[in-house]
């Protein structure tokens, strides 16, 4: 553990927090940074304040008043110990020796006797916890994701590589000048060996740089991804109810692009500006025509790059809908082949699938043709510029304006100049992508919709009352001015399209607009927060049977808590103990069984018994549904009412339909 030394007597607490954060989270806090982040009282931090600030730095600090023997028995890697007006960190290194990290004196050892004399009887254990995530927005986005030290390191490494390349180009001029009189064969050997070594060294340096970059990039990426996932764990239910899982997963792509912008494009811009300026001046001083060729090469490369960028952007916009359609139809085909046998629907899906595949293939062909065309055009112009430089060089040598060595020198630095100058243009496209990805990442941290409800004291209702409830079911049929009193264990039934499922979904408080009032006892449904309703109102749909094994959703725990042998017999008779593959009826029995330990909730069952065999349906109702009504408020929607002879109340929703 590295010591952070205090500069004032009251700073020991913040230094201790900083040292622990650095050791546990591999952070790099320094003294001045800690002073900025912690509001330091004149008398220093107390143990209670250290507990509070510890959460900000990802530390779970719990303080105690102990005997010395209890201190020795504490199971914690690091322990904060309070001396008189001072805090230190200790580790029990040996049986009678303590390793002390003191922000005032540094690192030293204390025996049990000496530590006991200095100790005041107060200590705190330290454990790793989630760091508090500050709100991320556009104004602080740069400071949260930009690592100045890392960018400086990248620039430094690449400058070394460029310096070596420039020195080698300069050395080539000297070597050729000094060997020009040795004869043609010697010159040829020198040039071949020299340029082979030059190219090999340059490639080696580039590979080393890329390996270092990749290692540091992925280390940084994993850290930021963990930071984002940690921040998501602090979000409310409302946040997740307004964001699909795909929105959260795709942020990994945006994170990569943002980090690439900071760690690749910004260093490249800095390097490119420096190199283009210095080498451009060097070329211009030696020979203006070579500078003009380099500028022409930059213009052509920039034009080709811009065309490729905008073409790819345009074609990708066309591609996305067809890719989404292809994925959607793939899922439907999978369902058709696994869950049903419908040749007519299969042919229809295959027809649309082929159309989507053909469109995607055409788009991919266009992208590939564009890529090859750009590469060939770029190669053609590169060859043309090389011949132009060579031609000018030969003419210059014939006219004795400069020597052969100068031509090789210009070849080297002119190529370097055009390469790095073109990167400046590429930076413009990177900015475009960065702004888009930044917007997406910022939106990840923002809860755009607030929970407008008010958290009331939840109590399982004895009655749900509807007062002048009106809701449109479709264009012409609705429930208008519906006033009802719904009791526990009520069964809702009615003709198809009478709004039974819609009626239950309205009671969840999510997804449907209605007028009038819905009250749980005397509490209006609209006064409850979405998070509260999600926690206390269960809506189960009989057709939504995603679980395929009895192990799903805590089957073993439910079995352990069950005290009724008749339920064990029911599960055995229904074959639910066969955990490899369940039928629809078995899944419904499992679904109801897993509710058996729920209490003080509103449970809405939407045809959750329609697939259960008629001979055991009444047993299922008596053993799994009816017990739920003892500790919960249960409303059912069913077509088959043979089991519901004992239900307290039945409501035929067909009688309340109105044609508009």
From Swiss-Prot:
Membrane topology per record: Multi-pass membrane protein
Main subcellular location: membrane
MF terms in GO: ATP binding; ATP hydrolysis activity; cysteine-type peptidase activity
Cellular compartments annotated: Cell membrane
Residue ranges of every copy of the ABC transporter domain listed in the record: 464-657
InterPro entries, per the entry: ABC1_TM_sf, ABC_transporter-like_ATP-bd, P-loop_NTPase, Peptidase_C39
One Pfam family linked to the record: Peptidase_C39
Active site: 12
Coiled-coil stretches noted in the UniProt entry, renumbered to this chain: none
GO biological process annotation, one example: proteolysis
Positions of ATP binding: 494-501
Source taxon at top rank: Bacteria
Gene Ontology CC terms: plasma membrane
Residue ranges of every copy of the Peptidase C39 domain listed in the record: 6-126
Record-linked SUPFAM superfamilies: ABC transporter transmembrane region, P-loop containing nucleoside triphosphate hydrolases
Record keywords, A-Z: ATP-binding, Cell membrane, Hydrolase, Membrane, Nucleotide-binding, Protease, Thiol protease, Transmembrane, Transmembrane helix, Transport
TM regions (residue ranges): 150-170, 188-208, 265-285, 290-310, 379-399, 402-422
Family the entry assigns: Belongs to the ABC transporter superfamily.
PANTHER family: SKFA PEPTIDE EXPORT ATP-BINDING PROTEIN SKFE
Name of this chain's protein: Putative ABC transporter ATP-binding MG390
